[in-house]
Amino acid sequence: GLTLRTKANSIDADVIKMLHEAAERAERDFRAMVIYNQGEFFCVGANLFAVVMAAQQKQWDGLREMIHGYQYATQRLKYAKVPVIAAPYNMTLGGGLELCYGCDGVQAALETYAGLVEVGVGLIPGGAGTLNMLWRSLEAVPEGVEIDTQAFVVQTFKNIALAKVATSADEAKAFGFFRPTDGVSFDRARQLHLLAVGAIGEQVGDDAALDRHDHGL
């Protein structure tokens, strides 16, 4: 499993490097990868202090490298050869939600606040969140059904432009931030157990296993 250990579990250069290394090791040595953080927040996104300092010092190459590195890291998880599951809780904002977008499945705490909020500080999502928020909404469309894709693009743009935040895991599902099949845990103490069930039982594909355990069946 992977656990962030930065302040508020924020994203910085060391975390980005760790994500790449964790994906490689998971593919080499394990059957699945689990992202389970500790502390008050799951992940509040990028370390804005580091971003501001780099900008003030005009370290444009370093900023460019960090943005590209996190984009690649989330996509690296998305296309990993082993299933990746995240256990978001509390604040799962900006890069925290982008991290979830890179996962095959989510076992979220009911009290999860999720959204791409970068526009609030004058930025746009930098970790492939713009792409993956749209992709996640399109995933819910049944195969073969004709749709107006522009409507999905417009809604994604609104979600990002208004920094829309879901105030619960269920609302995150309703907004299309999480999949309908993603799990929700009322008790964080059970979250890790349910996470393991999802990772082992059919490598993320057995959503029924999560449902049975969450309802005590």
Q: Language model features by range: what are they?
A:
Residues G1-L2, I16-D61, H68-A87, A109-Y113:
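A structural preference for short, pocket-lining loop segments at secondary-structure junctions
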Residues G1-R5, L217:
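Glycine-rich phosphate/pyrophosphate-binding loop
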Residues T6, G39, S137:
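A broadly conserved detector of short glycine/acidic/proline-rich loop/turn motifs that flank catalytic sites
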Residues L63, Q71, Q75-A196:
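Conserved catalytic cores of soluble enzyme domains
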